[in-house]
From Swiss-Prot:
Gene transcribed to yield this protein: pyrG
Matching Pfam families: CTP_synth_N, GATase
Positions of the UniProt region annotated as Amidoligase domain: 1-268
Lineage, top ranks: Bacteria, Bacillati, Bacillota, Bacilli, Lactobacillales
Subunit: Homotetramer.
Cystine crosslinks: none
Name this polypeptide is given: CTP synthase
Species of origin: Streptococcus pneumoniae (strain ATCC BAA-255 / R6)
Domain Glutamine amidotransferase type-1, first and last residues per copy: 293-535
EC primary class: ligase
Amino acid sequence: MSTKYIFVTGGVVSSIGKGIVAASLGRLLKNRGLKVTIQKFDPYINIDPGTMSPYQHGEVFVTDDGAETDLDLGHYERFIDINLNKYSNVTTGKIYSEVLRKERRGEYLGATVQVIPHITDALKEKIKRAALTTDSDVIITEVGGTVGDIESLPFLEALRQMKADVGADNVMYIHTTLLPYLKAAGEMKTKPTQHSVKELRGLGIQPNMLVIRTEEPAGQGIKNKLAQFCDVAPEAVIESLDVEHLYQIPLNLQAQGMDQIVCDHLKLDAPAADMTEWSAMVDKVMNLKKQVKISLVGKYVELQDAYISVVEALKHSGYVNDVEVKINWVNANDVTAENVAELLSDADGIIVPGGFGQRGTEGKIQAIRYARENDVPMLGVCLGMQLTCIEFARHVLGLEGANSAELAPETKYPIIDIMRDQIDIEDMGGTLRLGLYPSKLKRGSKAAAAYHNQEVVQRRHRHRYEFNNAFREQFEAAGFVFSGVSPDNRLVEIVEIPENKFFVACQYHPELSSRPNRPEELYTAFVTAAVENSN
């Protein structure tokens, strides 16, 4: 069977849920027995989002092979339950840098390097490579931004050319748009969608399906009008209604026959998607009776997308505990020794997630100290693990001024120090310890119990600094347990205080491996401890 290509574009406004629509379709096709992969095209000129501010971009999602990618890849992995790779996120910066390197090496044999064919060919190669490396039946490609953005033009041209390259039966174009509702007039307006499709057709792409984002049901009359003016079949105008829970969306799209229309267009002979397990999960999510309160102490809390995988992992772990996780967003910049008890007193559990830079670190240390001294279940992640070690050094070991060499290079007690292989690296982007690495677990520890007594667990990392082994014996003598280390015992991966109900911190990012129907084990152990603490 020929590989099938589905391209998802957006119009009218950005942030209308293209990624969720693409991920939901991926889940439906996977549940039909098809092998699916998915990728995101981002038209910005950065090589990747690794050096972008979380306020600009939200979370950086790390793949198994160490690519720093768009947060939509997190949605893709959680919905479809697949592990993506570096070919799953492509930016303008990445494409141009590769083309320019080829030009410098003389690979274009003296030709004038142009957007067409060189940039568009490079984009098409990324699409085909993503399919080849995963041996997929179907590849879904989402293009970030909206039709009409000047940055998107080479991407859309590459998508247009794909139809001629692989055949019309192997390509489908899905266009997602906003259908605004004017409350004063009491009606929905189709004109923005019509203009968006007109713009897309002007670039040579005729959409085969429209997905309209609406607050209210559109009605068949609106769908017929859009079908007539946008030249798509009425049944191929699909609603994406606002929902209470994201995981309802695949079921809503299936109910409208979206996946069947896609299969018919692409001539895919696949059985109906069995969504029984997914439906049961959604039903459970919609009927959670109890709540558990988790305080998330972070520096980017004004933009919650900066912690989207953390939030989803907490929710997933709540599902298996039959509780709804209510998150109390605590700005680490506001936390002091004087107000920490007031800010965290009603927390059943406290999580201190990752981050970079000095700002907010002292507030996080106060939150960690509160959790340790008051025996509140606590999970530290990445920087949260490093600050857990610093807090213990200061307030238990009495090492006044203990800090990280990253945050205070002149500290007398560099509890956290730069990794040896990072010392001479000058570039910031793409140079961290990135991707999947193993952690060897200590028998009898809370970490080992969380992971069902596995000897080794593999999780994704994103860091440059590590625990300084010169202090390891001193910590252990005071009851601090290093419950996870690299197989060569050189790098500390997990720490804990066994006397507390749950006081565990890890250098890696467990949230990146969590799925709604298969929550990450360390998060689950943390939420379970928080539930027990609330009773």
